[in-house]
């Protein structure tokens, strides 16, 4: 059986006139649309029912046949087929043109395909097409050249000179069509290849371009003359609707206007031709027809766009596809879905981790069909119709049925913007009164939600498979780790942290200190009877059964710690249980802050898995809220104690500043030095005041507790509250040398307040800009890596990628352990001192093994990496390593490309926008933050370029009056000299030994230079470590593998330099794997292989260079991508996610992969035993 949606690839091509007539159901001859009196379509018009089908279901135009029983009959009076009105969305018409016209995409695009294949300049072509010049089609015996242009005067002169029939020249699309018809593609191809061998420079580039177009036509089976249109397709009327507004006027799609102009001009041209009008009039009409067709296909591409009322350019066919509002992005990639709702969220601290509160009315509407079915099943309603009536009238018994339906049916909750995959999670719904959705406090971090009016959307998974996936893969209790770095995302925040911190504090000299209790229960009783303070240091006797033997002893602790440890598994490894005296100790015997809570959760997850962790989290949440309430931790101005030392510190600094000013006035130091010194002084003073403040705060001071626990606020905020605000920047980002000496507690004066506003306002402006930039970066990253899916277990590569710790100066930015854990080594790792093999090649390394390797003093390790993966499509599981979100090995079918893009894009909003000023005048601005990440991923030439050594050797410095020169002497004694401009900072010293690609001066390096000097591995390394530096400086951890996925996509193309005996064209870009394949085939035949070199593409270019034209067209430059694809007759293999979403198929990832879809289920009931079904505890 042929299913419409069951195909493996999609091809695009040029439509021949025959094809267009074949699609069509009839010719549109009149420009009329709808008769405004009868509101029925005019016959042969743009909405004609005979061509496109009936307006009403099962009803012909004249009303002779009505009802479904006449299905398929064609009315003998009006010629309309009796069928569903839906066919008006799919039936096409056509317009037969009186004169051929050119297709603007192929004539006007860059490069002009028509111009290249004819070897005419686009300007010359334009003159011919728009009737400004004649082109010689056949010079016959005359000295004129073929394709030579003649203006009106020259044409007349030539005719006078050589006679009427002595040569053939014409103008307009007819002439171009004749020329295109005459092209012999095979012959042209051979000739161009011959020419290519001898030509150089600009001429060679032009020949390569022409050859590319000729080969595209030759291989695709498209004919060049199809670029000139004889017949225009008319799209179905329901895709360009016309609706009546109140008041009797009509609103219509712009396309109808554009079609109408084409039909009007075409009919006028036919009439003129029949009348045998003078040439000049006909020519003018043909030109107008050409312009009308241009406007229909792509309005505004040539000349001024055709405008509608109010000077608004009309939306042409191309505009319907382009941009955010176009067909691709608006309707194919982002559809609205049924069974969904949205509402405001409120906090639900009483919920379990996997639950959410769903408002009753909303649930009833969302689960309506399920409730109706259940009502019938339970015998509460006789048929679906009465069940529907019951639900709509909300009868009391409906609620019980709803509870029953909802009990095991998960729902998906989503909060926009969905920046990473944790932006949609599944929950078990619980019915709640009111109209707000209740959300568990621990999932707020993942959603980045708060309860100040945020809204969330609910979606109901309908099929059993969808419900199963939601429950097992998307349940909030299973998504505890962040996919970007594998750290817990469900970490308690704010009150929960404060409560836990409060519980685990201890205090000297409080009630009950030093008491001894017989068991933990007695401690709790004493605490509840207020006989002992929660922070009192007490002793308690504990009993434990370990390996069958009972151990008891006395431990020192506090009631708070006993309470806190009730919810913590006692085997997380914080305490070394092998030591006898530690066997009874409480696991968490320290002050708990947000950071340590993260560690506890991480250890619990690694040791006990998701279910136990989510139970522990719920207990910590409950205790945290309870005890932060009991602790009654509040803020008041009396908690902000201004430190005693502040006045003295300020006076001292002012004296020193005065000294510096004096030195400046006397000319001992320059203006810059003075400024630098003053800034340094005030920075240090602000620090000193802050330190004095922190020292003077009591550990039970509520503000201190909030900051120290990580619940809210930070040291710098406390500094501003009670210390001093310190230095501020002016609007241009330069630091003002007068600091704000007051704190908020003391109050700011007018000038201080005014200076503060600069920073605040700039911050707000920055944030707004940053959000948009960050979103766009994410979109490009998704597009470049969306087809990277884990497609096989092992690609069998022998290669590896060498990693070592990433350093910035002396500071370690990313240690080796982090780079190794969750990876496979590509060769045996051997201990350099003992010579034993620590890890065999292709063995999985967890964190412990990675630590062993690092502790053995090994500095560099070769690991399997996405960079060296040999899978043609996607990556293999071995090269990818561990799945960060589960800390298990990655499964086949995981969409690692999208996860990588989200992991890099999601923290984008946290990166700063500003460019930092380095000290000194001539220090070039170093771009950092988001712009730097973008610069790296787009492989742009950075601002503030560093000078890079092209060779390895020893540094020799020379300084003359005019300039500084650095000479690098290679081992062969060859000298390469570099002139250093004054003001740039030199990174090397005399006598240093440097290698090729090292920086001589400070600044950023152009990645293309690194590719040239150090090769492809060098540039991959550089991009990886540079991007990591930007993120790590902002305290964002991203695992290397995500960056590797994107960088691999940037370095996948090879630029052909010499085609050898292959079919490849020099100067074109081709996928590395296709290149190797082509060479392998040629070598087997004994031919000469092609030569090429890896090209580094920015993410935008790389996304547009993908094999899939659907994915590229839906990304950017839609018309250019489609023009190119159509000429080449490209086939989209539908391997990525985007293209499958566009055509409405399941994505080839996860359970949508063919290997999972084509599983056959054998139902052999006898083999299935009841007790073998594991009960799954949620």
Curated annotation (Swiss-Prot):
Pfam families: RNA_pol_Rpb1_1, RNA_pol_Rpb1_2, RNA_pol_Rpb1_3, RNA_pol_Rpb1_4, RNA_pol_Rpb1_5. Keywords: DNA-directed RNA polymerase, Magnesium, Metal-binding, Nucleotidyltransferase, Transcription, Transferase, Zinc. Its EC number is 2.7.7.6. Zn(2+) 2 binds at residues 795, 869, 876, 879. Binds 1 Mg(2+) ion per subunit. InterPro entries: DNA-dir_RpoC_beta_prime, DNA-dir_RpoC_beta_prime_bact, RNA_pol_asu, RNA_pol_N, RNA_pol_Rpb1_1, RNA_pol_Rpb1_3, RNA_pol_Rpb1_3_sf, RNA_pol_Rpb1_4. It comes from the Bacteria. HAMAP family: RNApol_bact_RpoC. This is DNA-directed RNA polymerase subunit beta'. The lineage of its organism: Bacteria, Bacillati, Bacillota, Clostridia, Eubacteriales.
């Amino acid at each position: 059986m042929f299913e419409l949606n069951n195909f493996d690839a999609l091809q695009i091509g040029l439509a021949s006139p025959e094809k267009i007539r074949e699609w069509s159901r009839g010719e549109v001859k009149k420009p009329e649309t709808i008769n405004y009196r009868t509101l029925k379509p005019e016959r042969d018009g743009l909405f004609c029912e005979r061509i496109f089908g009936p307006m009403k279901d099962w009803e012909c135009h004249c009303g002779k046949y009505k009802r479904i029983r006449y299905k398929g009959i064609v009315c003998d009076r009006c010629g309309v087929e009796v069928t569903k009105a839906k066919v008006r969305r799919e039936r096409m018409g056509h317009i037969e043109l009186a004169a051929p016209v050119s297709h603007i995409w192929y004539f006007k695009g860059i490069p002009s395909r028509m111009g290249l294949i004819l070897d005419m300049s686009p300007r010359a072509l334009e003159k011919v097409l728009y009737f400004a010049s004649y082109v010689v089609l056949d010079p016959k015996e005359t000295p004129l050249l073929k394709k030579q242009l003649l203006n009106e005067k020259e044409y007349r002169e030539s005719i006078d000179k050589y006679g009427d029939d002595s040569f053939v020249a014409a103008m307009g699309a007819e002439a171009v069509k004749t020329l295109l018809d005459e092209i012999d593609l095979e012959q042209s191809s051979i000739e161009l290849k011959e020419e290519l061998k001898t030509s150089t420079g600009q001429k060679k580039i032009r020949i390569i371009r022409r050859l590319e177009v000729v080969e595209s036509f030759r291989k695709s089976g498209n004919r060049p003359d199809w670029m000139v249109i004889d017949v225009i397709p008319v799209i179905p009327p329901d895709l360009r609707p016309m609706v009546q507004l109140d008041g009797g006027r009509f609103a219509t799609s712009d396309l109808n206007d554009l079609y109408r102009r084409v039909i009007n001009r075409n009919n006028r041209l036919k009439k003129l031709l029949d009348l045998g009008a003078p040439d000049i009039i006909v020519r003018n009409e043909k030109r107008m027809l050409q312009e009308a067709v241009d406007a229909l296909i792509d309005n505004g591409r040539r000349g001024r766009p055709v405008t509608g009322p109010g000077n608004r350019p009309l939306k042409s066919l191309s505009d319907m596809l382009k941009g955010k509002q176009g067909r691709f992005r608006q309707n194919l990639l982002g559809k609205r879905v049924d069974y969904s709702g949205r509402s405001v969220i409120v906090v639900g601290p009483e919920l379990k981790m996997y639950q959410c509160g769903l408002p009753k009315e909303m649930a009833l509407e969302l689960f309506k069909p399920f409730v109706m079915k259940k009502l019938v099943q339970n015998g509460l309603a006789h048929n679906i119709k009465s069940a529907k009536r019951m639900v709509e009238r909300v009868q009391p018994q409906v609620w019980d049925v709803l509870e029953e339906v909802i009990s095991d049916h998960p729902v998906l909750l989503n909060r926009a913007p969905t920046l990473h995959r944790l932006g949609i999670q599944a929950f078990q719904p619980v019915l709640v009164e009111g109209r707000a959705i209740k959300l568990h406090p621990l999932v707020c971090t993942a959603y980045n939600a708060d309860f100040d009016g945020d809204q969330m959307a609910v979606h109901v998974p309908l099929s059993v498979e969808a419900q199963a996936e939601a429950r097992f893969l998307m349940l909030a209790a299973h998504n505890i780790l962040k996919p970007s770095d594998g750290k817990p995302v469900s970490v308690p925040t704010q009150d929960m942290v404060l409560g836990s911190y409060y519980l685990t504090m201890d205090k000297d000299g409080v009630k009950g200190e030093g008491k001894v209790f017989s068991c933990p229960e007695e401690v709790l009783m004493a605490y509840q009877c207020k006989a002992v303070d929660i922070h009192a240091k007490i002793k308690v006797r504990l009993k434990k059964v370990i390996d069958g033997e009972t151990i008891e002893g006395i431990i020192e602790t506090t009631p708070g710690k006993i309470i806190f440890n009730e919810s913590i598994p006692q085997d997380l490894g914080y305490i070394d249980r092998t030591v006898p005296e530690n066997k009874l100790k409480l696991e968490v015997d320290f002050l708990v802050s947000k950071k340590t809570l993260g560690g506890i959760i991480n250890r619990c997850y690694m040791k006990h898995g998701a279910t136990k962790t989510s139970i522990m989290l719920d207990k910590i949440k409950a205790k945290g809220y309870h005890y932060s309430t009991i602790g009654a931790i509040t803020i008041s101005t009396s908690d902000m104690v201004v430190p005693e030392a502040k006045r003295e510190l300020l006076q001292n600094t002012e004296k020193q500043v005065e000294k510096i000013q004096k030195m400046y006035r006397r000319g001992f130091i320059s203006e810059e030095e003075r400024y630098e010194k003053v800034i340094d002084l005030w920075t240090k003073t602000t620090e000193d005041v802050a330190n004095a403040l922190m020292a003077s705060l009591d550990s039970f001071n509520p503000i201190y507790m909030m900051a120290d626990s990580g619940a809210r606020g930070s040291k710098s905020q406390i500094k501003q509250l009670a210390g001093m605000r310190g230095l501020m920047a002016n609007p241009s980002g330069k630091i003002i040398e007068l600091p704000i000496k007051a704190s908020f507690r003391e109050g700011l004066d007018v000038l201080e307040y005014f200076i503060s506003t600069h920073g605040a306002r700039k911050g707000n402006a920055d944030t707004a800009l940053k959000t948009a930039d960050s979103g766009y970066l994410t979109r490009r990253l998704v597009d470049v890596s969306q087809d990277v899916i884990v497609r096989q277990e092992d690609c069998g590569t022998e290669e590896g990628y060498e990693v070592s710790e990433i350093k910035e100066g002396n500071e370690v930015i990313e240690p080796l352990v982090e780079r190794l854990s969750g990876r496979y080594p590509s060769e045996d790792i051997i201990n350099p001192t003992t010579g034993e093999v620590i890890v065999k090649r292709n063995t999985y390394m967890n964190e412990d093994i990675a630590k062993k390797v690092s502790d053995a003093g090994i500095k560099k390790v070769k690991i399997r990496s996405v960079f060296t993966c040999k899978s043609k499509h996607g990556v293999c599981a071995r090269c990818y390593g561990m799945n960060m979100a589960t800390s298990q090995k990655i499964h086949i079918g995981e969409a690692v490309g999208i996860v990588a893009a989200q992991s890099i894009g999601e923290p984008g909003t946290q990166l700063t926008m500003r460019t930092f000023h380095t000290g000194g005048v001539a220090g070039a601005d170093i771009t950092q933050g988001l712009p730097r990440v973008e610069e790296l991923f787009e492989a742009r030439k950075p601002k503030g370029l560093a000078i890079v050594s092209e060779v390895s050797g020893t540094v020799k410095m020379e300084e003359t009056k005019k300039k500084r020169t650095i000479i690098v002497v290679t081992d062969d004694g060859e000298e390469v000299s570099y002139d250093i401009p004054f003001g740039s900072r030199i990174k090397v010293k005399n006598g240093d030994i440097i290698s090729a690609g090292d920086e001589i001066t400070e600044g950023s390096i152009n990645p293309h230079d690194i590719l040239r000097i150090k090769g492809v591995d060098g540039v991959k390394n550089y991009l990886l470590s540079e991007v990591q530096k930007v993120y790590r400086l902002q305290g964002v951890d991203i695992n290397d593998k995500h960056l590797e996925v994107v960088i691999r996509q940037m370095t996948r193309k090879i630029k052909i330099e010499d085609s050898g005996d292959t079919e490849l064209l020099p100067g074109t870009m081709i996928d590395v794997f296709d290149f190797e394949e082509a060479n392998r085939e040629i070598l087997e035949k004994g031919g000469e292989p092609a030569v090429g070199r890896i090209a580094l593409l920015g993410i935008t270019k790389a996304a547009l260079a993908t094999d899939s034209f659907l994915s590229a067209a839906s990304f950017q430059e839609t018309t250019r991508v489609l023009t190119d694809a159509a000429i080449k007759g490209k086939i989209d293999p539908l391997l990525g996610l985007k293209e499958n979403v566009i055509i409405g198929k399941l994505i080839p990832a996860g359970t949508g992969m063919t290997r999972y879809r084509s599983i056959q289920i054998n139902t052999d009931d006898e083999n299935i035993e009841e007790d073998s079904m594991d009960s799954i505890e949620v």
